[in-house]
């Protein structure tokens, strides 16, 4: 850490412009007002596509970085408003149309529902019996479990929260308008990274975690303790009573003096043992609820709060003390990295695409990590035995993660095309990566080929041996074994090493690594996962699909500005169909096209992950516990024997498990049957755009226009075929939508039918 003399670094002034942009409803009412050519109105049908493509492309509205920054900042508030309205709607459904109170009284036998379909012409068939005399649509968002963990005990509290969400949405809409039209920050404010880090670390993350820890200690833990003890929700004191009446807390946790200030005295006097009743270090899962101990969670959030509040005081702002990000980056050099990170400060403070690329890649990776943790270390009471919710949350976080990572590559390529400055990046890490991009991409290509042929070869070998009646020559746990020895070693390490690495913790992080079965109400919430040859094989398919996705996306970023084929690619922009007539073989080389192709491989990668997860959990984890202690898994442990060849995946996973969705007609699951059928249609519809030539459609359109002219009903706006890129965009959107909805219907119909 260094200090800076005052004269070298002037005080940062937080400055705003007053009334920079007038509020004009008249202007906003004109479609395309942000672009001079679009504002003239439509001449051809291409206008509507360009309107959508450019509405949020602020770079095309203005080249002024300050104005672009303000638009992004304002849009963030608009986005938050949408999120609050969306959340408010879900809480309102919980308040008005749900069986939350009934579920709270019996979370083992009653299923969550927060939507009741109105009878118009027979749709009421969708209202299934979820237990407790309630009929409605089964929900799988995990919100009921989250609400219980937070200490919500009745529908009125949900209604109040829903109203609060609308108030917050209104505030965000106001803030978005105010900070663009009335008091708009100057560019220096957006580029003041040290202040931003301090506020985000100490404020959002630090105080946010502290507030949540406070809520858990004062509201959630006491209410959950009473619920776990069997106290009816109606007899539990209201949340504010635990805060305003110290006697209630004293009754539950007598070792702390629950006064206005006396409660925090042990914290500052380091007498932390007083808090041991509600800030625990138990580890593992609560056997009653199958979830992480709420008292462990409160402990975690308090510790995180302290860390982030400290972290929020590390960076140098007005007081000349602390770290400078620019200095840290410029000092960050290794023996083989030339100028190291020099220039990256300028990159990340002048290109929001570069900043966004990193953020999307990080948050996408984090979402995938969340998916892996949420089932193994279920955070909310009774959610571990709600298998439909578990599969939904895993699938959701995997898709979101994959989409965000592709978005990271998209904005990385946009940065390279629009914002990259060779003068700033001289022999730094970015420049050096770009200069040896051929070595990177060719090696990555070799890895993809190796993984592809070997991983697929395992399955082809097994299909062949099975067809020849030679099971002893198959790769399997009973034939030629390919045991995942490193994964098994990590599992045993996590189980056994806990005694020496964390002596105060009562159990390892999750029974999934080893230990006892956690069963709630006769259903397995979590138990040790045995890995074998089938997992080893599908793992290498995961490795292949991930590496191919990375190959496509990284190639798109590294060759976005230039390539041997098109040295001046940067001049053509982020998206272009081909490099003009007379340049054969230059189609589908733009940065945009790499994102387009990357999306398909991302879809492949995530699909195989969620299929693997779904089948593995049904085969080896989820099921019922018999009175004698034996476990009946949903698919009876068939993963190890069936997932080792392609025929097994087709027959015992896709075909066998689609029984529920295919046979759903005439039941409350019939909507999933229609979605399954309809989503297949949407997926097939996408192929019409993907296996297509623009000229074919233009010729067809001209014939149709000729017929309209003959009949004197020709439109004023000239019809035009979609451009090549528009066609690809429509194609990939429907491909992903169709594929994802098909999978959604397939999973949910099965898990809802299984109960």
Curated annotation (Swiss-Prot):
SUPFAM superfamilies (alphabetical): Photosystem I subunits PsaA/PsaB
Domain of life: Bacteria
Binding-site positions, [4Fe-4S] cluster: 578, 587
GO CC field: photosystem I; plasma membrane-derived thylakoid membrane
Residues that span the membrane, as ranges: 72-95, 158-181, 197-221, 297-315, 352-375, 391-417, 439-461, 536-554, 594-615, 669-691, 729-749
Record-listed chlorophyll a binding positions: 688, 696
Cofactor: binding details: PSI electron transfer chain: 5 chlorophyll a, 1 chlorophyll a', 2 phylloquinones and 3 4Fe-4S clusters. PSI core antenna: 90 chlorophyll a, 22 carotenoids, 3 phospholipids and 1 galactolipid. P700 is a chlorophyll a/chlorophyll a' dimer, A0 is one or more chlorophyll a, A1 is one or both phylloquinones and FX is a shared 4Fe-4S iron-sulfur center.
InterPro entries in alphabetical order: PSI_PsaA, PSI_PsaA/B, PSI_PsaA/B_CS, PSI_PsaA/B_sf
UniProt: chlorophyll a' binding residues: 680
Annotated source species: Synechococcus sp. (strain JA-3-3Ab) (Cyanobacteria bacterium Yellowstone A-Prime)
GO MF annotation list: 4 iron, 4 sulfur cluster binding; chlorophyll binding; electron transfer activity; magnesium ion binding; oxidoreductase activity
Name the UniProt record assigns to this protein: Photosystem I P700 chlorophyll a apoprotein A1
Topological type in the membrane: Multi-pass membrane protein
A biological process from GO: photosynthesis
EC category: oxidoreductase
Task of the protein: PsaA and PsaB bind P700, the primary electron donor of photosystem I (PSI), as well as the electron acceptors A0, A1 and FX. PSI is a plastocyanin/cytochrome c6-ferredoxin oxidoreductase, converting photonic excitation into a charge separation, which transfers an electron from the donor P700 chlorophyll pair to the spectroscopically characterized acceptors A0, A1, FX, FA and FB in turn. Oxidized P700 is reduced on the lumenal side of the thylakoid membrane by plastocyanin or cytochrome c6.
HAMAP family found in the cross-reference section: PSI_PsaA
Summary of subunit composition and partner proteins: The PsaA/B heterodimer binds the P700 chlorophyll special pair and subsequent electron acceptors. PSI consists of a core antenna complex that captures photons, and an electron transfer chain that converts photonic excitation into a charge separation. The cyanobacterial PSI reaction center is composed of one copy each of PsaA,B,C,D,E,F,I,J,K,L,M and X, and forms trimeric complexes.
EC number, as in UniProt: 1.97.1.12
Matching PROSITE patterns: PHOTOSYSTEM_I_PSAAB
Residues that, per the record, bind phylloquinone: 697
Stated family: Belongs to the PsaA/PsaB family.
Subcellular location: Cellular thylakoid membrane
Recorded catalytic activity of this chain's protein: reduced [plastocyanin] + hnu + oxidized [2Fe-2S]-[ferredoxin] = oxidized [plastocyanin] + reduced [2Fe-2S]-[ferredoxin]
């Amino acid at each position: 850490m260094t200090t800076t003399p005052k004269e070298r670094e002037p005080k940062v002034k937080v400055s705003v412009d007053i009334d920079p942009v007038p509020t004009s409803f008249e202007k906003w009412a004109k479609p395309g007002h942000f672009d001079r050519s679009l504002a003239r109105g439509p001449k051809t049908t291409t206008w509507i596509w360009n309107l959508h493509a450019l509405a949020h492309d602020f770079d095309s509205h203005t080249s002024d970085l300050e104005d672009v920054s303000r638009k992004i900042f304002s849009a963030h508030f608009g986005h938050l408003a949408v999120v609050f309205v969306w959340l408010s709607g879900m809480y309102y459904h919980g308040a008005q149309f749900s069986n939350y109170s009934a579920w709270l009284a019996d979370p083992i036998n009653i299923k969550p529902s927060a939507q009741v379909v109105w009878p118009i012409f027979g749709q009421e068939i969708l209202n299934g019996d979820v237990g407790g005399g309630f009929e409605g649509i089964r929900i799988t968002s995990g919100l009921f479990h989250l609400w219980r963990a937070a200490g919500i005990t009745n529908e009125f509290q949900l209604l109040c929260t829903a109203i609060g969400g609308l108030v917050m949405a209104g505030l965000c809409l106001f803030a978005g308008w105010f900070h663009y039209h009335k008091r708009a920050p100057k560019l220096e404010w957006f580029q003041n990274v040290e202040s931003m880090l301090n506020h985000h670390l100490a404020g959002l993350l630090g105080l946010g975690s502290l507030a949540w820890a406070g809520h858990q200690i004062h509201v959630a833990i006491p209410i959950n303790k009473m619920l776990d003890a069997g106290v009816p929700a109606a007899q539990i004191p209201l949340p504010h009573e635990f805060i305003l009446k110290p006697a209630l807390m004293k009754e539950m946790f007598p070792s702390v003096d629950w006064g206005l200030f006396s409660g925090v005295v042990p914290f500052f006097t380091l007498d932390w043992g007083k808090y041991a009743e509600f800030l625990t270090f138990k580890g593992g899962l609560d056997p009653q609820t199958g979830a992480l101990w709420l008292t462990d969670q409160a402990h975690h959030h308090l510790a995180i709060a302290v860390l982030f509040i400290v972290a929020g005081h590390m960076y140098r702002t007005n007081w000349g003390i602390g770290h400078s990000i620019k200095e840290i980056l410029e000092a960050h050099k290794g023996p083989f990295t030339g100028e190291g990170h020099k220039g990256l400060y300028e990159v990340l403070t002048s290109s929001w695409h570069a900043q966004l690329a990193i953020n999307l890649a990080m948050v996408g990776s984090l979402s995938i990590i969340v998916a892996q943790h949420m089932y193994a270390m279920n955070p909310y009471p009774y959610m571990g035995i709600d298998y439909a919710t578990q599969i939904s949350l895993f699938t959701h976080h995997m898709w979101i993660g994959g989409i965000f990572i592709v978005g990271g590559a998209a904005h990385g390529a946009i940065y390279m095309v629009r914002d990259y400055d060779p003068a700033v990046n001289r022999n730094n890490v970015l420049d050096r990566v770009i200069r040896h991009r051929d070595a990177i991409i060719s090696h990555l290509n070799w890895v993809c080929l190796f993984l592809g042929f070997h991983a697929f070869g395992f399955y082809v070998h097994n299909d062949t041996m099975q067809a020849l009646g030679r099971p002893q020559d198959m790769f399997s746990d009973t034939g030629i074994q390919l045991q995942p020895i490193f994964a098994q070693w990590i599992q045993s390490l996590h189980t056994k090493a806990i005694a020496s690495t964390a002596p105060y913790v009562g159990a390892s992080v999750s029974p999934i690594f080893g230990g006892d079965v956690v069963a709630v109400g006769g259903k397995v919430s979590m138990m040790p996962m045995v890995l074998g040859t089938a997992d080893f094989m599908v793992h290498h398919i995961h490795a292949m699909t991930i590496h191919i996705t990375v190959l496509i996306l990284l190639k798109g970023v590294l060759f976005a500005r230039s390539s041997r084929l098109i040295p001046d690619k940067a001049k053509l922009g982020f998206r272009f169909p081909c490099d003009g007539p007379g340049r054969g073989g230059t189609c589908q080389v733009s940065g945009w096209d790499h994102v387009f192709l990357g999306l398909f491989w991302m879809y492949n990668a995530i699909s195989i992950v969620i299929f693997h997860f779904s089948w593995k959990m049904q085969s080896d984890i989820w099921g019922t516990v018999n009175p004698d202690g034996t476990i009946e898994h949903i698919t009876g442990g068939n993963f190890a024997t069936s997932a080792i060849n392609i025929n097994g995946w087709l027959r015992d996973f896709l075909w066998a498990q689609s029984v529920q969705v295919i046979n759903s007609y005439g039941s409350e699951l019939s909507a999933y049957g229609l979605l399954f059928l309809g989503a297949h249609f949407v997926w097939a519809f996408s192929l019409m755009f993907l296996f297509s030539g623009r000229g074919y459609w233009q010729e067809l359109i001209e014939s149709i226009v000729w017929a309209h002219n003959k009949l004197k009903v020709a439109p004023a706006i000239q019809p035009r075929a979609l451009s090549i890129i528009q066609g690809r965009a429509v194609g990939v959107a429907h491909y992903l939508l169709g594929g994802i909805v098909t999978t959604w219907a397939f999973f949910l119909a099965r898990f809802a039918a299984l109960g």
